[in-house]
Every structure is written in C-alpha cells, then in structure tokens.
Amino acid sequence: AEANCMFPAMFARWFLENSKAFQEKGAKFIHNAPYILAHLAGLSAEEMFIDWGAMSGWGLGYNVYTKEWSKEQLDLLKLDMKYMPKIVKPWDIIGKLTEEAAEETGLPAGIPICAGAGDTMQSMIGSGILEAGHAVDVAGTCSMFCVSTDGIVPELSRKGSGLIFNSGTLPGTYFYWGFIRTGGLALRWYK
C-alpha cells in the first residue's frame, strides 16, 4: 500500500514535527491498547511496548520478518528510535495488575497482564485462518477482506493495490488486507 496519513508512522512523524508538547515531554509512540494495559500494570514510559502484529500495522518503520524496528526506515521517516516502544510477542506477560487498578476494576491485584494482539490479527485466528492460502471477509465497523500468505507477495505489494501487509499473531503467519472504512457500520444505517 502507499504511505498515507493512516499509517501510524506517518502520523508519528507529523506529530513529532508539529506538537510542541510532545517535543518537550513525549517519551514513546504507542497505541491505545498498550497504553491502557501499561497503566493497569503501572509501567513507566520507558517500559512501553507494542506487540509484533500491531507493530506491523505501522506500515512503515519495521522489519516484518525479524519483528524489529528498522533503523533504516525510521531514519528515512525522520523518527528517532528512542520514541519507539519495545516490541513484544502477543502472549508476553508485560506486568501484573496494580493494587490501584484492582480497586478500580474489581479484579484481583497481581494477576498477570498479557500484551495481547490487534483485532484484525485475532479475527484471523478466530476465523480459523492458521496457514497460508486462506481468506476471510470481515464485516466489522470496517469491512475487510484478508488473505493469508507465507510472506510478502510482490504482486499484492505493488503501488496502488490498496492492500496492507501484516504479521499475524502466531509466528510465521502473515496476511494482506484491504478495507472500506464504513463497511460493517453501514449496516446500522441500513437497518
């Protein structure tokens, strides 16, 4: 897919260039799910994380095969590595529920908190897509069509394809997906 403002890496670059507050006090770029989990576990800014599936959703700035940030791509994007959270496996335990969070949630303090994975990655597993060569149509808030592969497929990665390449939740799983932003949500309007 072509780089556009939808990719978190592009937003991060814009934000870093245009937010005086982040320039002065910002520590890491993270998604909402790791932010919430980190607060439940009482993690510091330096302990922030992102799972490899959500990380691959950045679209730019990472190496999908090594599951590491790509210094070369981040340099091209003018994003300093210091702003990138550590990359973890979706099943890694990132901490334990704090006493304060236990009081607020009603859950027992000290229970382990797992990093988790993105909704699209998990929907692939939930649909039974565990190996290459399968597809699923998802009618969630967005309407998506996902196809599992063994890795990057040049024909699907060409400019203008409208497809995004991602790591799956499980090791060695990959998929392409395209979406329409109002797909499934439009069913509410139709009703």
For each feature predicted by the language model, list its residue ranges.
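Gly/Ser/Thr-rich active-site cleft segment
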Residues: 2-118
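Catalytic phosphate/nucleotide-handling subdomain of diverse soluble enzymes
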Residues: 103, 107, 111-191
